[in-house]
Curated annotation (Swiss-Prot):
It catalyses: 5-(2-hydroxyethyl)-4-methylthiazole + ATP = 4-methyl-5-(2-phosphooxyethyl)-thiazole + ADP + H(+). Keywords: ATP-binding, Kinase, Magnesium, Metal-binding, Nucleotide-binding, Thiamine biosynthesis, Transferase. Its EC number is 2.7.1.50. GO terms for biological process: thiamine biosynthetic process; thiamine diphosphate biosynthetic process. The lineage of its organism: Bacteria, Pseudomonadati, Chlamydiota, Chlamydiia, Chlamydiales. This is Hydroxyethylthiazole kinase. NCBIfam families: PRK09355.1 (NF006830). One of its GO terms (molecular function) is ATP binding. HAMAP family: Thz_kinase. Pathway: Cofactor biosynthesis; thiamine diphosphate biosynthesis; 4-methyl-5-(2-phosphoethyl)-thiazole from 5-(2-hydroxyethyl)-4-methylthiazole: step 1/1. Belongs to the Thz kinase family. Its cofactor is Mg(2+). It holds the Pfam family HK. Disulfide bonds: none annotated.
Amino acid sequence: MLEQMHEALQRLRQEQPVVLNITNYVSMDFLANCFLALGASPVMSVSDLELEELIGLSSAVYINIGTLDHLFIQRAYRAVDLAVRQSKPVIFDPAGSGATKIRTEVSHHILSHATIIRGNASEILSFGDVPAKTRGMDSANATHDAKDIAVALASECLCGCAVAVTGSEDFITDGKRHATVELGDPLMSRITGMGCSLTGVLAAFRSVIEDSFEATRLGVEYFSLCGMLARERCEGPGLFKAYFLDELYAADFDRMRRYHNQ
């Protein structure tokens, strides 16, 4: 597994794929820095006027609805339509789906066109008939609560999509293959934008790995291992954020091996 991660990182740093981000304003800076630390080239666009050209240049399109308004919704819908026409993978983070009616409606609209969907348990549950508990952007459900919905979502997808339910443990599926990841550190949940940045990492990995399930699995594991290494170096969230970027960049697989082989 670590060898596959290493190969993916090498490809990212050799190819430096462009990833177009239609994302929220809260985590935009941290997200862009995560892409750069990996070796990818992020574009953080807020203009409809350049969408078609930028999608043509991009290897993947990442959409996150964390700070949506009517202009953002129009831009996201158009980006999805253009990405589908140009056969570009759409990586989707349904931030807050289930918390409000509009977020849930927008998420359902984008869902059917997504190549990878990454959300917490409550967000993924909002796509099924099971009542979800939310605390704004945070989940009040455990990962195992959303596994059946995740499998059903991935199974219904016609384009080989993958679904990741993330939390204290992570579950990844494409409807046929399943993986559970029990890595990471609780301090990661104390920093805004970590989930958004995880989805961005998945977009970067999908830019160089055609198989959506493998891209998602490797991306989740790499992100989680970097969190564990960053936690070794600090006690609180302020320094953790800086050390986490350092670990994304360092790709220290020798240190990762201690956790990955447990």
